Structure formats: C-alpha cells, structure tokens
Amino acid sequence: FLYWMKKTANRYLPLSSDETIGVVIMPHGATKPYNDAVERTIEPLRSKYKIEMAYGMGDAVTIQNAISNLENQGIKKIVFVRMYPTSDQLKEKTDYILGLSDKIPEQWDGLIPPQIRNSAVINTFGGYEEDNLIAGIFLERIKELSKKPEEETIILLAHGGSNDKAENLRKKRM
C-alpha cells in the first residue's frame, strides 16, 4: 500500500529543475568485451542522469536491484531502456516485471517471478533498430574500420528472432 501511495504521489509531482531522472538500461549482456563496450557507450550520459545497468534478458532480481538503487538515491521518475533491436523485444516481459502490466507474457518460459516493488514512476522504450539513426551509426563505425573501401565488402549478421512471427516482422521492417 505504501508503494502505491508513493507512486501515485510521484505521478502528480512535477519534475523540479534540480531533480534528476533515473535511467535503467537493460542490455542483453554477454562477454566482458561486449559489456565494456556498452558501458563506454553510455558513459557520457552519466553526467546528466543517474544510471543503473540491468544486464540480462528481463531478470526480475536484477531489475529490482537497479530500480531500488535509483530510488535509494531519491529518484522518483525512471526511464527503463530495453537495449534491444526492436521495440517489442522483451516489452511484455519487462512491463509485467515492472508492474506496468498485469498480463503474463505469452513467451514466458519458466516460473513467473514476482513483480517488482517500487514507488517510482516508470516509462519504457526500446528498439534501436527501428530508428533511422542506426544506419548513420553503422556507416560511422564502418568508416572507422575500413582501410580500402574499394576492396571491402560489408556483411551485417544477426542471430534472428526467437520465432517465425518475430523474424517475419523483422524482415518486413528491413
């Protein structure tokens, strides 16, 4: 009940000029070189936002810890970033865990974890592949690596979707 009261109050409080927005970033997580690259990428954002990382594919304990760490710093408004290619990737799962939805996701595998307990107002987004800026980022990275463009071929690889429906949607978007 106390969490609900705080969350309701936070929803109506305007963001003051000295108040910081918290950000939880949920990348896939992998090997140390991958994780280090992610950390370097988001480092410039740390001067403007309080940031917590929640590596993994929607682990409720990791998400709870990240949200709690921000709340313990006085953060009342949080942006939850699903750092995945498409906007719908893990959205149902994380929305359920974050308490933004009561619908148990269709693609759920294993035991259903509890929804997190928090008083912050949370908004979510994801889907970097759907943003036109990604093409410019790819081009910039290719130019950094390229030595002899006239002799080189660029191949982009991805492991694909978790099911045929997701893969067909991905191909349609391309």
Tell me the role of every PLM-derived stretch.
Residues 1-174:
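Active-site-proximal alpha-helix that buttresses catalytic centers in soluble enzyme cores
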